[in-house]
């Protein structure tokens, strides 16, 4: 016997479009995360405002449908290990390749737009700042997020406590029923609208909290050996890192140092846009950071995170000084990060010497050989595993 169910009572549970929309949101978020590396490798990202938009390709979702197979004989069964979205067809027909015309249907691809601000939201999900140790005297009082502390009768509409408001209305209605019974009237109460007295709003209170003080020191080699591609990679690394940290933490100071054979403190705009030429003394940039730390940022009360980007091509007479400088700044810092860009020969760059001779646990080095390595380098520098390693 056929059974018919009335689905009109609850449209939400039987609305198929809800599941489609949920799958669509998942697909969009997955595509954005998969394309983060490509977005971060665009030169146009440096210096852009938070409203700058970037296009991301999204594969379309098709409705389920029955299609004709290859007319093969027999019936096949699954292994029981299939998951949603797996292709289980045994059809092995090959697509036309070598840029020749074919007769197979293509995949629907469309684009969605994401702003730089939204991009940072996705980066925040994957990255986290290395541990900010609680320095004894470096805590700053900042205002924390507002917390709900009870209810009140007056407030702004966004803070309306709907559940509490309904409960107040029900209590008033029950009170009216009791009053009618007491005077001998059992009249049925009809429509019972809300009144101003029923409204309840969340009482919000802000509590101050202490937040650790930190300084990020960005050091960049701008010598003649750092061509436009290398400088672009370095600036991309520092730009994304600075935007991420500013978004996630308050009261983080930034210092910018550029160097050739000599180093100088520059402002943020000059750091990301101005170029120079000349020889390379790696020690000059790191020593400038050391002097800055000793002058302004006492390691006993500050969390210090210097990051240095170079192609590793150093003047040979400066190599020993560079080694001494790296050891010293590592002793003064919570973590010192060294990023080597497009190294020509692995064994002849400073990355090789640093890796071999620097034994500091808080010294972290990575190489970026091409644009696509940039995202992985950022993730490695700021990974949670690295935090735990430094904490130990």
Curated annotation (Swiss-Prot):
In residue numbers, the region (Disordered) covers 75-100
Biased amino acid composition, Basic and acidic residues? 81-94
Pfam families to which the protein is assigned, alphabetical: DUF444 (PF04285)
Q: Which InterPro entries match?
A: Spore_YhbH, UPF0229, vWFA_dom_sf
Quote the SUPFAM superfamilies the UniProt record gives: vWA-like
Going by the entry's taxonomy, the superkingdom of the source organism is recorded as Bacteria
CDD domains noted in UniProt: vWFA
In terms of NCBIfam families, this protein maps to: spore_yhbH (TIGR02877)
Recorded family membership: Belongs to the UPF0229 family.
Q: Which PANTHER family match?
A: UPF0229 PROTEIN YEAH
> Can you say what this protein is called?
UPF0229 protein CPR_1333
Species for this entry? Clostridium perfringens (strain SM101 / Type A)
Lineage summary = Bacteria, Bacillati, Bacillota, Clostridia, Eubacteriales
């Amino acid at each position: 016997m056929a059974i018919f169910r009335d689905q009109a009572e609850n449209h939400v549970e039987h609305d198929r479009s809800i599941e489609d929309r949920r799958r669509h949101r998942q697909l969009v978020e997955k595509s954005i995360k998969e394309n983060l590396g490509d977005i971060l490798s665009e030169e146009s990202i440096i210096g852009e405002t938070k409203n700058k938009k970037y296009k991301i390709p999204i594969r379309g979702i098709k409705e389920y449908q029955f299609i004709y197979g290859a007319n093969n004989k027999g019936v096949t069964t699954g292994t029981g290990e299939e998951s949603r979205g797996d292709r289980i067809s045994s059809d092995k027909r090959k697509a036309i390749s070598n840029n020749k015309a074919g007769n197979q249907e293509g995949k629907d691809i469309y684009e969605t737009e994401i702003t730089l601000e939204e991009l940072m939201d996705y980066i925040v999900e994957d990255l986290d700042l290395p541990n900010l140790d609680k320095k004894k005297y470096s805590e700053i009082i900042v205002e924390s997020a507002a917390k709900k502390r009870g209810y009140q009768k007056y407030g702004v509409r966004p803070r309306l406590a709907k559940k509490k408001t309904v409960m107040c209305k029900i209590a008033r209605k029950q009170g009216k029923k009791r009053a009618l019974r007491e005077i001998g009237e059992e009249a049925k109460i009809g429509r019972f609208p809300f009144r101003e007295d029923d409204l309840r709003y969340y009482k919000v209170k802000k509590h101050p909290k202490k937040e650790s003080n930190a300084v990020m020191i960005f050091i960049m080699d701008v010598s003649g050996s750092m061509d436009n591609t290398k400088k672009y990679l370095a600036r991309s690394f520092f730009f994304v890192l600075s935007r991420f940290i500013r978004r996630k933490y308050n009261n983080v100071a930034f210092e910018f140092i550029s160097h050739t054979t000599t180093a100088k403190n520059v402002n943020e705009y000059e750091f990301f846009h101005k170029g120079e030429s000349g020889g390379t003394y790696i020690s000059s940039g790191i020593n400038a950071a050391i002097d800055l730390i000793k002058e302004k940022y006492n390691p006993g009360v500050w969390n210090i995170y210097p990051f240095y980007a170079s192609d590793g091509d150093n003047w040979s007479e400066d190599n020993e000084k560079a080694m001494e400088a790296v050891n010293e700044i590592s002793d003064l810092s919570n973590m010192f990060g060294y990023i080597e860009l497009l190294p020509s020969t692995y064994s002849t760059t400073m990355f090789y010497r640093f890796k071999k001779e620097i034994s500091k646990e808080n010294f972290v080095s990575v190489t970026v050989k091409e644009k696509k390595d940039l995202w992985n380098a950022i993730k490695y520098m700021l990974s949670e595993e690295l935090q735990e390693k430094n904490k130990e």
